[in-house]
């Protein structure tokens, strides 16, 4: 597999509905499902779940 196929760049969009996003990379071999991380949303002013958007 090429480098870009194994660790693609993904967007993490806030579930609070603010439209705030984080950009990161993930390893598809270790995390084949959609990623969900709890991170700080400055627009909401609190920690919320961020879901992977491809």
From Swiss-Prot:
GO molecular function, one term: structural constituent of ribosome
Gene3D superfamilies registered for this protein in UniProt: Ribosomal protein L33
GO biological process, one term: translation
The keyword Ribosomal protein is assigned to this record: yes
InterPro entries tied to this protein: Ribosomal_bL33, Ribosomal_bL33_CS, Ribosomal_bL33_sf, Ribosomal_zn-bd
Keyword Ribonucleoprotein among UniProt keywords: yes
UniProt keyword terms in alphabetical order: Ribonucleoprotein, Ribosomal protein
Source organism, top-level taxon: Bacteria
Similarity comment text for this entry: Belongs to the bacterial ribosomal protein bL33 family.
PANTHER family found in the cross-reference section: 54S RIBOSOMAL PROTEIN L39, MITOCHONDRIAL, LARGE RIBOSOMAL SUBUNIT PROTEIN BL33M
Protein name: Large ribosomal subunit protein bL33A
The species this protein was found in: Streptomyces coelicolor (strain ATCC BAA-471 / A3(2) / M145)
Upper classification of the organism: Bacteria, Bacillati, Actinomycetota, Actinomycetes, Kitasatosporales
């Amino acid at each position: 597999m090429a480098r870009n196929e194994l660790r693609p760049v993904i967007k993490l969009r806030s579930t609070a509905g603010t439209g705030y996003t984080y950009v990161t990379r993930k390893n598809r071999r270790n995390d084949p499902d959609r990623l969900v991380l709890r991170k700080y949303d400055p627009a909401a002013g609190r920690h919320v779940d961020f879901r992977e958007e491809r």
